[in-house]
Regions:
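Gly/Gly-Pro- and Ser/Thr-rich, intrinsically disordered tail segments characteristic of DNA damage-repair
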Residues: 1-213, 219, 336, 340-344, ...
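DNA-contacting surface of Y-family translesion DNA polymerases
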Residues: 6, 179, 187-331, 338-359
Length: 360
């Protein structure tokens, strides 16, 4: 049986700022969003108590929390700390799947320290992050990625939770459907209309019922409700492309808000590219709208690139080529593919992918 750990840093950007600036500790702070039409990148737990959230317009955040302190974004610093965190991970395993600068899965089934108990590795990683970096992390331990993620969410912030195989079905049964991967606001509403509100309700539905109502995602929900998730922890270095996505807190068709989200995606993607030392010639933008339709646009270039400046410039060009004024966006994704050795000469001409429908 596999042993999977999910590590999720607590309010990462805001916590780094509070660590580096002791005068901010214990105060409600927002990273980014100070400009008149800016958007909050991250909020400290003190600010979250007032309802301040990431991707929220700064003006709204200030109304919710008049004493909110805005600090500028410092992605170079966040990447530096993220690299230090990953260096700690690598002391225990090289089977690491980064999700973002502040989140990762680790497969410690076979590990470098010969520790049979995954929970002890998770406990040691959390201790080292606290002592060496002055930050806190939440960790979930289980036998697959779905349950490890659920476990880390259950004890945030600064917690450790283990879900053993014998506990999995009871744990899942009590989960609200909103806690399941792939269940956003609209899907949750559809589930509620069908009388599905918890993992137990979901488990009562047949595979045929779930796929009829939710398409391909129905199979995933069926498996998750039974504690089944066979997805491996994916090494970054075996991938032919690297990308990341961000789901909005609120759907938006406001260009400033959408482009602020794209900048955040670029920053996360840049961190992954740097760790992998990966470059590519094809950039793909993926947009999911409020009605769950999906549109992809791709452009290929003669030279491989990976700089955040070019990622942002070319990503914005793809985004600004779309007409979404009447189509609020709920998710943006950006990926870089075709490393230098994989794209044949002469394939540099810009290419556009057609509109495509997709399941949530």
């Amino acid at each position: 049986m596999r042993k999977i750990i999910h590590i999720d840093m607590d309010a990462f950007y805001a916590s780094v700022e509070q660590h580096d600036h002791p005068e901010l500790r214990g105060l409600p702070i927002a990273v980014g969003g100070a400009e008149s039409r800016g958007v909050v990148c991250a909020a400290s737990y003190e600010a979250r108590r007032f309802g301040v959230r990431s991707a929220m317009p700064g003006a709204k955040a200030r109304k919710l929390c008049p004493q909110l302190i805005f600090v500028p974004v410092n992605f170079d610093r966040y990447r530096e700390v993220s690299r230090a965190i990953h260096a700690i991970f690598h002391d225990y395993t090289d089977i690491i799947e980064p999700i973002s600068l502040d989140e990762a899965f680790l497969d410690v089934t076979e590990n470098k320290v010969g520790e049979p108990m995954a929970v002890e590795i998770a406990r040691e990683i959390r201790r080292r992050i606290r002592e060496e970096l002055g930050l806190t992390a939440s960790a979930g331990v289980s036998y697959n990625k779905f349950l490890a993620k659920i476990a880390s969410d259950a004890r945030k912030p600064d917690g450790l939770c283990t879900i053993h195989p014998s506990q999995a079905l009871d744990f899942i049964a009590e989960l609200p459907v909103e806690a399941f991967w792939g269940v956003g606001r609209a899907t949750a509403e559809r589930m509620h209309l069908l009388g599905i509100r918890t993992g137990a309700d979901l488990r009562e539905r047949s595979l045929e019922q779930l796929t009829r109502h939710f398409g391909k995602a129905g199979r995933v929900f069926y498996d998750f409700a039974r504690g089944v998730d066979e997805r491996p922890v994916i090494y970054e270095w075996v991938r032919k492309s690297l990308g990341c996505e961000r789901t909005f807190g609120e759907n938006s068709a406001e260009p400033l808000v959408v482009e602020a989200h794209l900048r955040e995606v670029v920053e996360e993607l840049d961190g992954r590219l740097q760790r992998r030392q990966f470059s590519g010639r094809t950039l793909t933008l993926r947009v999911k709208f409020a009605d769950f339709s999906v549109l992809s646009r791709s452009a290929s270039f003669s030279e491989a690139f990976s700089s955040p400046e070019l990622l942002l410039q070319r990503g914005l060009e793809l985004l600004r080529g779309l007409d979404y004024a009447d189509r609020p966006i709920r998710l943006l994704g950006l990926s870089l593919s075709h490393p230098p050795e994989e794209l044949r000469p002469g394939m540099w001409v810009q290419q556009w992918l057609p509109f495509a429908e997709d399941e949530e």
